[in-house]
Swiss-Prot record:
Protein's UniProt keywords contain Repeat: no
Coiled-coil intervals, chain numbering: none
One BP annotation, GO: secondary metabolic process
Start and end residues of each stretch annotated as AMP-binding: 2-239, 248-322
Matches recorded under SUPFAM superfamilies: Acetyl-CoA synthetase-like (SSF56801)
Species this protein is from: Cochliobolus lunatus (Filamentous fungus)
Pathway: Secondary metabolite biosynthesis
Protein origin, superkingdom: Eukaryota
Stated name of the protein: Acyl-CoA ligase clz12
Main enzyme class: ligase
Record bears the keyword Nucleotide-binding: yes
């Protein structure tokens, strides 16, 4: 269990406060993300009361979302990327839902990497060009670390600028240089809002905190005062000595017509480690061969030459919208166990 002080929460909620008085619309929030999540809690519970803007809560995120936006005059909401995808799918089935979304002005987005194509597709739902998708980066161990404040728009793929209470840098231990000269590595965060300890686990606390710097496990870089995330360190795939980002592959997969959801992960160990992809298609017409052909046109051959692709009905996700890669890996192992035993 993560231990944080009262002071850390006070500093975080003050640091994430947006410039509501500068907005040319009344802030009216609809919340439908898990209240216990580090992304949701400081806004849903603390700032809602502290700042006093009208707030509405859905018991669960479902197809009535657009109806609630229209009914209660909602201007801002919070969502994970998977939720944005669902909203797009609902509007494709029911055109009136797109109309009911038009009052939205700001969508705070966190919980997983937001693919550029998904971001663009969601913004196309709106007649107004002033609608903003604002990414948020953080974790339970310290709440929010970075975001953008009104009225800044960003279309560079950044997850935000550091909060006033945060220092963010790239670890010197894991640092590497990209071809364009950018220094990339594990991102470290320091500030008074960080956890005090993992309760009952002093070794884990010592591993996570070094001289006050928290190891986030996220690989990224800093440029022009903005933070960019490449992928989670634990999710990085290594094939024959080459490093592959699942997020990069998933972004390309989401750009293929007919694909509504996708995930990439590593499978196997040592020399047998390779890329495994799971794809949710709109219909039966999409073939694995077509997906492989598209991938070979968009990314370096070594990244996908030995990959395996599986068409599935859905992807397992956590309440916050993150793909549960461990579940997919377990399902894949079970599949091969059945094949080896002759039961599949």
């Amino acid at each position: 269990m993560v231990q944080r002080s009262h002071r850390s929460l006070v500093l975080e909620t003050g640091g994430i406060q947006d410039r509501n008085s500068a907005k040319p619309f009344q802030v009216r929030r609809l919340y439908c993300t898990p209240i216990f999540h580090a992304f949701s809690f400081p806004e849903m519970v603390v700032n809602t009361i502290r700042l006093g803007f009208p707030s509405f809560y859905m018991r669960r995120f479902d197809e009535s979302f657009a109806d609630k936006i229209h009914e209660f005059g909602i201007t801002e909401t919070m969502a994970a990327p998977a939720m944005l995808l669902k909203i797009i799918q609902w509007t494709e089935k029911h055109e009136e839902k797109r109309f009911k979304l038009q009052g939205l002005r700001t969508i705070l987005c966190a919980g997983a990497a937001l693919a550029s194509r998904l971001r663009a597709s969601f913004l196309q739902l709106f007649d107004s060009a002033s609608v903003r998708i604002v990414q948020v980066w953080g974790m339970t161990e310290g709440g929010w670390f970075a975001t953008f404040w009104y009225p800044e728009h960003d279309d560079t793929g950044s997850i935000g600028r550091p909060l006033p209470t945060c220092q963010i840098r790239v670890s010197e231990v894991s640092r590497a240089e990209l071809p364009d000269g950018r220094q990339v590595g594990e991102l470290l965060v320091k500030g008074p809002q960080l956890l005090t300890a993992y309760k009952g686990h002093p070794d884990a606390t010592k591993e996570a905190l070094h001289d006050g710097w928290l190891r986030t496990g996220d690989i990224g870089y800093c440029a022009d005062g903005k933070i960019y995330i490449i992928d989670r360190a634990k999710d990085i795939i290594k094939v024959n000595g080459w490093t592959i980002s699942p997020a990069e592959l998933e972004t390309v997969l989401h750009q293929i017509p007919g694909i509504v959801d996708a995930a990439a992960l590593s499978y196997g160990t040592g020399t047998k480690e390779h890329v495994a992809m799971f794809v949710v298609a709109e219909g039966p017409s999409l073939l694995v061969a077509d997906i492989k052909h598209h991938l070979l046109q968009q990314v370096a051959r070594f990244k996908v030459a030995t990959c395996e692709i599986h068409l599935v009905d859905s992807l397992p996700r956590s309440p916050s919208g993150k793909v549960l890669r461990s579940v997919l890996r377990h399902q894949l192992q079970a599949h091969y166990d059945n094949v080896d035993s002759g039961t599949s």
